[in-house]
From Swiss-Prot:
Name of protein: NADH-ubiquinone oxidoreductase chain 4L
Transmembrane segments: 1-21, 24-44, 57-77
Function field: Core subunit of the mitochondrial membrane respiratory chain NADH dehydrogenase (Complex I) which catalyzes electron transfer from NADH through the respiratory chain, using ubiquinone as an electron acceptor. Part of the enzyme membrane arm which is embedded in the lipid bilayer and involved in proton translocation.
Record membrane topology: Multi-pass membrane protein
EC number, as in UniProt: 7.1.1.2
Family, per entry: Belongs to the complex I subunit 4L family.
Pfam families per record: Oxidored_q2
Amino acid sequence: MNPTTFIISFMIALSGLAFYQTHLLSLFLCLEGMALSVFCLMAISSSYTLSLSTIPLPLIMLTFSVCEAGLSLVLLVTMTRTHQNDLMSSLTLLKC
């Protein structure tokens, strides 16, 4: 696969993160898309270099991505229980 494909997918996920800011779930899905594209890019680049120091990097990235997915699920469930929705507009800090 071409690394340009994963860079384009990262940019698409980044633009989704910038434009779709209404629901918390859509933001978390865009973050997961970004993490997946970075993981694929790291896996391909470590297979090209064939260096022993770059082999565990995709696994470390995958571990951080799983932790991020778990934390985002906890945040989504907590927000849904407290605010009864996942809209970003209900997270304003300036409510008086």
